[in-house]
Design a protein with these regions (language model features):
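Gly/Ala-rich beta-loop-alpha elbow adjacent to hydrolase catalytic centers
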Residues: 71, 75, 79
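Short alpha-helix in the alpha/beta-hydrolase fold that links the catalytic acid
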Residues: 177, 186, 200-209
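Short beta-strand/loop motif that positions the catalytic acidic residue
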Residues: 184, 190-192, 196
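Conserved acidic catalytic loop of the alpha/beta-hydrolase fold
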Residues: 49-66
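Conserved alpha/beta-hydrolase catalytic His-Asp/Glu region
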Residues: 104-106, 124-182
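Flexible "cap/lid" loop of the alpha/beta hydrolase fold
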Residues: 80, 84, 90-124
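Conserved HGGG/HGGXW glycine-rich cap/lid loop of the alpha/beta-hydrolase fold
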Residues: 1-40
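Catalytic histidine-centered segment of alpha/beta-hydrolase-like enzymes
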Residues: 222-235
Length: 260
């Protein structure tokens, strides 16, 4: 599980009940270098350096095991890199509002829209918290705020600004992951938000064409934190993705391989 930039593993912890319900998956939630409790050394100066740190983590902690990877936003770009690096060892790829076009000026983005504003809620919050919440919230509500407070805000208050600044200054990967591999046959789930004004959804639809076994869902009333905006729909899609991978790895199934 790989989170996005400026947050930490807690952004994705709300998905854990869905993943745990099947009872067969060990979940590993990373804190990327410079975020959460992971320190970024001076060598972390680009997205490529972060990607290599994640590759090293997989090699050191998973050995030769097969694994699935789910990446959100910046973590989606890193998840794609893992597919390019490990190939058939990756059982499935989950992309949650992933970065597809690294250069912001080249992204196809919808206009910024707030579908439901709650000025009373914002006025009740700490001003800094209200600003961070309002930047991404598509539907402002008490429940939506509480999910943001518990999942996103801790990481936003903890990241190493110097380290993240170095990464952001060298943001694109040197080689697009899909240019490194000819094909990937595992189940791919791509979830985008219709109102995601950070990475958009149109570039994500174009990326889906690079994967032969890809399920795409553009969630309505969802922005860049689509899993916080639409937790029920996100959970159902993730459950289906897990089911697809479990079907493949059953004994006798075509392409079955060792369970994680």
């Amino acid at each position: 599980m790989i989170h996005g930039l400026c947050v930490d593993h807690r952004l994705l912890l709300g998905l854990d009940p869905v993943l745990a319900a099947r009872g067969t998956w060990r979940r590993i939630y990373l804190d990327l270098p410079g975020m959460g409790r992971s320190v970024a050394g001076p060598q972390i100066r680009s997205s490529d350096a972060v990607a290599e740190a994640v590759v090293d983590f997989v090699r050191e902690n998973l050995g030769g095991q097969h694994f699935a990877v789910l990446g959100n936003s910046f973590g989606g770009m890193l998840a794609r890199h893992l597919v390019a690096e490990f190939g058939h060892r990756v059982m499935g790829l989950g992309l949650l509002c992933p970065v597809v076009v690294a250069e912001k000026s080249r992204r196809t983005l919808p206009p910024r829209r707030i579908l439901h504003a709650d000025p009373h809620l914002l006025a009740s919050l700490d001003p800094a918290d209200a600003t961070d919440y309002a930047e991404l919230a598509v539907i402002q509500s008490r429940g939506n705020w509480e999910r943001f407070r518990d999942c996103a805000l801790p990481g936003l208050r903890a990241f190493d600004r110097r380290a993240v600044g170095r990464i952001a200054g060298n943001y694109p990967l040197a080689v697009e992951p899909e240019d490194r591999v000819s094909s990937f046959g595992g189940p791919v789930l791509l979830i985008a938000g219709r109102q995601d004004h950070v990475v958009g959804f149109e570039d994500q639809l174009a990326l889906a064409g690079r994967y032969g076994n890809c399920t795409v869902s553009v969630l309505e009333e969802a922005g860049h934190n689509a899993h916080l905006d639409q937790p029920g729909q996100t959970g159902a899609l993730l459950d289906g993705w897990l089911a697809d991978m479990e079907d493949i790895r059953r004994p006798g199934a075509a392409g079955a391989h060792r369970a994680p």
